[in-house]
């Protein structure tokens, strides 16, 4: 009892106190608030946790120290765990804190439950604020829990950044009891998906032609073990005219398993090849330019820059990059580089290769020349050289800039130049290539009144009573479902549209208000609203993926106004000691019960006497005066009022875009979204929301910025708020995936084929190769011809790498080369055009109309990754096999193929001929297939599998031409899509991201920004909906589609219908079965009665189906 009285006495004098909870062990102290100073300026930095299973480290009572933070400096709310500790652990004390109002006093009750008896301490103090607040705190909001370490993966940290004596005062400015109904409250639903008749399967039959060269099945008399070859090369650059050369002579290293034999060594054309074991050193390219600086950050990419119009390195003395802890043994941990002289002309100087020793310092030297070298597109040239030496032989690690430009040259002239016939909306402009597939497409085409989905908000041009820009956030309880099947699974999930919760407006705006959209990047754009008669009076609204605030910046003499179609219930002015100086805070509760926080920041420190928001009606709030440079920030108030402090600490700073940067050591990739910010906040950071799949690959440091604030997205689960200016990631790359069949079951095991399997493969390949591939693609659009050419590239791989028949390999290679020549000469049915308006390569198929869909809308940037992925993979296979036969096909045609890569996935802003990352959305973790089309439900993607098929193709093409940046970037995209697609597209039974109402569907169907629709654009058959997320089945498929998921999907959706399906979809579904049951899959394709004309479309071969399922069936049995 004496202990309780002592604690009570202490609490009566200190509002934020240091309390020790004593357990059974008299020498064990559990620190709950690590703070000693009573200064009002001091900020507590600690780690409260959600009350789950945790362990507590024993600490010394004297080990704590006060922490203080300057409001103008960025705060990292890091763990306080520098204390001396031992290894003994105990069950954590479970804390709860509650505050409740009692007239003019606040009673504060803190309770602690140990393994024995509860301990309770109360503190009552006077509250002089004009209005008291009630709130409930649990463990996740208690300040300063120290040395608490998570013991389970489900543990979530909550950053604490609280003023020691934080206080809030409130004053109600407006209250209304007006009732609302109809669209004001519920919005409108857009659920229809237009259906077409174009089937993704290739129905045109091949053009048969007798081939003299055939495989002799009887010659295959023994079983074979196939050693999977992973080719890693340094950059061998085939440069175009007038380009700057910055590359080293091509060289390659082939990696074999430890039991490989010397006769497996293949010599690549124009390269110096040597077999090596994985522990031997490798070469990695850093180009076109890399700037390395000493850093203690675990995120290396932020120290890489590209500057200048030509490649040039900038290195500092004694570089100490820090690499992810998950990387393998040959990791650089301390200063490894000596001073590098880069003082010579930067015109063509570059750092080509770094060898990093795990035990010795490496000296890097670089020679350069200002000489400009001109070469033809088919030549390989070197104008610089770099060497790296170590004092002794040792294993090395290497670093690759993942976002090196593929090229900065003009696309080949074989592509005609012409501006796209699609018209942009008025007021749309950009300094550089215009993005065609990003979240803001609705703002640049059509009426410009459909929303941009900037998770967690949607925003759109508002032209009703309050002209301006509307902001909406919908919650999980506003999801609508419909079309339930007999198992209770909903056909669709849809969010309401058109609920203008708040509207950025101005008293000056009317129906003549103009809208401009500019500064378009892969992550952001800017909307500018202005008076029609005076453009100096304008409102700018930056739209950035992940933004925690909707922000409007008022310029000129605009008189700010906030509107709402829902209507205002109450408006309260608040003050908070957690705000940076000069920020005014308001709490706006709408008539539907939703509360928004509003922060007002002026160019000079604002006070409530100088400026205020005034209510003019239930639907309008007006500023008391016009202020040039006024900033208004709006955010949905968190459900946990304790977490509101983080919005306070973030207010005043807003984001304008983010830069994408990353590096890889060959097995792990680290990358980040580095946000550009404006303004100042109390914490030096702002609020950024992350999607569920981000959490799977966050770097450890991100847990220190977690706030506990959660907001629902429209179709991608719950987002978490972070007090930060960057999102940082580290992820492992699956480097087992290469040319030949692979599954997660196979892992690092070797492929094996029996002689009987090889003989059947030979017979089927002989039959399927009796064609003219050139004639077989005649009359096909870009999508279909890509599928057909790629079909034969997989047969070529099978003949070359599995059957290993040289004569048939050569004849098949020539057959497919002849077909590809049609593309290289741009003489296919719908030639490609370089679009000078949107800076991309498009099909001419729909040049005359946006509604014809002859080429699935490729002309207007639909499906480019689907179409070009097949072509790029075929090119990679041709180049790979050709190089083994001492050919130079890849080097000769590199620029043409690279143009397709650049159109879809240009990684660098330095490439001015193509939009950066046109299709792949790095924030969402997958691509968007829809191009320049307005849609009220936002962007969409139907075929997830053809999305990652592009990344796989790009990876292999990068390996073929020695572009390791491209190769590893493909690996990174695959890794990201594995997380994203298993959250949003594929619904394993334990999926916790999407609602249970649709989990039973097993796949999304078409995933939109605003709706998940279990259907396809070409029909509602079950095999269509699931098959479009399967095709094509390739070595990368199992990395994305897990064995568990595929089996669940098979049992619930496919097995009940498979016997009734007799079409090309049958072959797709059965080959997909090989990802979990390759034995049964192989039995289907090897059956003597198998009918290819019934079960396969012309985009799929029986040869590859047998090679894929058969190899896996043998190797994992």
From Swiss-Prot:
Glycosylated. Keywords: Carbohydrate metabolism, Cell wall, Cell wall biogenesis/degradation, Glycoprotein, Glycosidase, Hydrolase, Polysaccharide degradation, Secreted, Signal. Residues 400-638 are annotated as: beta-sandwich subdomain. Residues 66-88, 365-393 are annotated as: Disordered. Gene3D superfamilies: Golgi alpha-mannosidase II, domain 4 (2.70.98.30), Immunoglobulin FC, subunit C (1.20.5.420). (1,3-beta-D-glucosyl)n binds at residues 867, 942, 946, 1024. One of its GO terms (molecular function) is endo-1,3(4)-beta-glucanase activity. The keyword rRNA-binding does not apply. Residues 747-1117 are annotated as: (alpha/beta)6 barrel subdomain. Residues 639-732 are annotated as: alpha/beta subdomain. Its EC number is 3.2.1.39. Residues 400-1117 form the GH81 domain. It is an enzyme of class 3 (hydrolase). GO terms for cellular component: cell septum; cell surface; cellular bud neck; cellular bud scar; extracellular region; fungal-type cell wall. Glycans are attached at residues 138, 186, 223, 259, 280, 303, 307, 393, 533, 886. GO terms for biological process: cell wall organization; polysaccharide catabolic process; septum digestion after cytokinesis. Present with 64 molecules/cell in log phase SD medium. Cleaves internal linkages in 1,3-beta-glucan. Involved in the dissolution of the mother-daughter septum during cell separation. This is Glucan endo-1,3-beta-D-glucosidase 1. It comes from Saccharomyces cerevisiae (strain ATCC 204508 / S288c). The gene is DSE4.
């Amino acid at each position: 009892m004496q202990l309780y009285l002592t604690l009570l006495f202490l609490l009566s004098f200190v509002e934020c106190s240091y309390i020790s909870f004593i357990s059974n062990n008299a020498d064990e102290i559990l620190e709950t608030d690590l703070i000693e100073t009573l200064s009002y300026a001091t900020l507590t930095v600690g780690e409260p946790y959600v009350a789950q299973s945790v362990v507590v480290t024993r600490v010394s009572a004297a080990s704590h120290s006060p922490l203080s933070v300057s409001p103008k400096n960025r705060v990292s709310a890091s763990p306080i765990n520098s204390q001396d500790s031992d290894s003994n652990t105990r069950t954590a004390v479970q804390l709860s804190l509650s505050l409740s109002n009692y007239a003019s006093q606040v009673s504060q009750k803190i309770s602690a439950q140990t393994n024995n008896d509860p301990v309770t301490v109360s503190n009552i103090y006077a509250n002089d604020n004009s209005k008291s607040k009630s709130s409930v705190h649990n463990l996740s909001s208690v300040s300063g829990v120290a040395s608490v370490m998570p013991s389970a993966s489900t543990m979530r940290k909550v950053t604490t950044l609280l003023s020691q004596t934080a206080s809030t005062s409130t004053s109600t400015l407006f209250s209304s009891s007006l009732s609302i109904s109809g669209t004001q409250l519920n919005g409108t639903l857009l659920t229809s998906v237009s259906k077409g008749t174009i089937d993704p399967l290739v129905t045109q039959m091949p053009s048969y032609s007798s081939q003299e060269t055939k495989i002799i099945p009887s010659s295959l008399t023994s079983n074979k073990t196939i050693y999977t070859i992973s080719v890693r090369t340094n950059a061998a650059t085939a440069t175009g005219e007038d380009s700057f050369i910055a590359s080293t002579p091509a060289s390659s290293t082939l990696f074999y398993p430890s039991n490989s034999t010397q006769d497996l060594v293949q010599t690549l054309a124009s390269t110096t090849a040597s077999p090596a074991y994985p522990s031997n050193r490798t070469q990695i390219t850093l180009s076109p330019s890399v700037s390395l600086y000493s850093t203690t950050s675990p995120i290396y990419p932020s120290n890489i820059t590209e500057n200048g119009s030509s490649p040039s390195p900038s290195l500092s003395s004694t570089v100490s990059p820090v690499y992810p802890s998950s990387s393998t043994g040959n990791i650089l941990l301390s200063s490894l580089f000596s001073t590098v002289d880069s003082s010579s002309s930067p015109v063509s100087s570059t750092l080509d290769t770094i060898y990093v020793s795990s035990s010795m310092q490496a000296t890097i030297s670089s020679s350069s020349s200002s000489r400009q070298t001109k070469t033809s597109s088919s030549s390989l040239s070197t104008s610089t050289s770099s060497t790296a030496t170590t004092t002794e032989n040792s294993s090395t690690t290497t670093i690759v800039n993942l976002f090196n430009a593929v090229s900065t040259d003009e696309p080949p002239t074989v592509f005609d130049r012409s501006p796209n016939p699609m018209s942009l909306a008025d007021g749309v402009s950009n300094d550089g290539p215009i993005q065609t597939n990003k979240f803001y497409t609705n703002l640049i085409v059509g009426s410009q009144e459909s929303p941009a989905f900037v998770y967690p908000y949607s925003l759109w041009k508002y032209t009703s009573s309050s002209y301006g820009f509307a902001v909406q956030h919908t919650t999980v309880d506003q999801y609508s479902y419909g079309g339930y099947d007999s198992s209770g699974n909903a056909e669709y999930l849809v969010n309401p549209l058109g609920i203008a919760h708040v509207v950025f407006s101005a008293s000056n705006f009317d129906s003549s208000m103009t809208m401009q959209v500019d500064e378009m990047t892969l992550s952001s754009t800017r909307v500018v609203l202005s008076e029609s008669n005076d453009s100096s009076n304008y409102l700018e609204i930056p739209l950035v993926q992940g933004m925690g605030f909707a922000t409007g910046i008022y310029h000129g003499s605009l008189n700010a106004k906030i509107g709402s179609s829902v209507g205002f219930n109450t408006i309260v002015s608040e003050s908070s000691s957690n705000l940076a100086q000069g920020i005014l805070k308001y709490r706006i509760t709408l008539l539907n019960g939703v509360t928004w926080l509003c922060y007002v920041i002026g160019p000079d420190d604002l006070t409530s006497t100088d400026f205020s928001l005034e209510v003019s009606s239930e639907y309008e709030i007006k500023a008391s005066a016009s202020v040039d440079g006024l900033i208004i920030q709006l955010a949905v108030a968190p459900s946990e009022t304790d977490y509101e402090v983080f919005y306070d600490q973030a207010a005043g700073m807003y984001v304008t875009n983010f830069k994408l940067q990353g590096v890889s050591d060959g097995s792990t990739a680290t990358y980040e979204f580095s946000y550009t910010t404006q303004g100042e906040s109390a914490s030096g950071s702002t609020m950024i929301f992350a999607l569920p799949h981000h959490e799977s690959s966050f770097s450890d440091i991100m847990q220190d910025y977690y706030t506990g604030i959660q907001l629902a997205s429209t179709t991608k689960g719950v987002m978490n708020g972070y007090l930060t200016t960057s999102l940082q990631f580290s992820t492992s790359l699956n480097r087992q995936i290469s040319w030949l069949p692979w599954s997660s079951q196979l892992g690092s095991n070797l492929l094996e084929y029996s002689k009987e399997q090889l003989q059947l493969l030979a017979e089927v390949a002989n039959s399927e190769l009796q064609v003219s591939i050139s004639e077989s693609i005649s009359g096909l659009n870009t999508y279909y011809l890509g599928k057909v050419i790629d079909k034969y590239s997989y047969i070529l791989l099978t003949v070359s790498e599995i059957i290993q028949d040289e004569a048939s390999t050569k004849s098949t290679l020539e057959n497919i080369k002849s077909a590809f020549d049609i593309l290289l000469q741009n003489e296919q049915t719908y030639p490609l055009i370089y679009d000078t308006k949107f800076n991309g390569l498009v099909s001419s198929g729909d040049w005359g109309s946006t509604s014809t869909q002859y080429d699935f809308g490729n002309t207007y940037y639909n499906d480019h990754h689907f179409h070009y992925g097949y072509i790029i993979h075929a090119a990679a296979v041709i180049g790979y096999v050709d190089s083994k036969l001492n050919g130079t096909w890849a080097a000769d045609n590199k620029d043409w193929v690279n143009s397709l890569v650049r159109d879809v996935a240009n990684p660098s802003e330095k490439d001015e001929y193509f939009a950066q990352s046109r299709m792949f959305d790095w924030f969402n973790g997958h691509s968007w297939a829809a191009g320049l089309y307005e849609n009220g439900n936002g962007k969409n993607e139907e075929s997830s599998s053809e999305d990652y098929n592009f990344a796989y193709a790009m990876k292999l093409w990068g390996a073929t031409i020695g572009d390791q940046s491209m190769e590893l970037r493909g690996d990174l995209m695959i890794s990201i899509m594995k997380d994203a697609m298993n959250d949003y597209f594929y619904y394993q039974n334990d999926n916790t991201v999407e609602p249970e109402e649709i989990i039973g569907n097993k796949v999304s169907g078409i995933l939109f920004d605003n709706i998940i629709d279990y259907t396809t654009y070409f029909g509602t058959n079950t095999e269509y909906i699931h098959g479009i997320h399967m095709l094509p089945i390739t070595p990368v498929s199992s990395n994305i589609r897990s064995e568990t998921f595929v089996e669940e999907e098979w049992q619930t959706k496919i097995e009940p219908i498979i016997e009734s399906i007799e079409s090309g979809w049958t072959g797709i579904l059965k080959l997909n079965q090989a990802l979990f049951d390759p034995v049964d899959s192989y039995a289907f394709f090897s059956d003597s009665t198998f009918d290819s004309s019934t079960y396969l479309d012309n985009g799929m071969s029986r040869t590859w189906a047998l090679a894929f399922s058969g190899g896996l069936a043998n190797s994992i049995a």
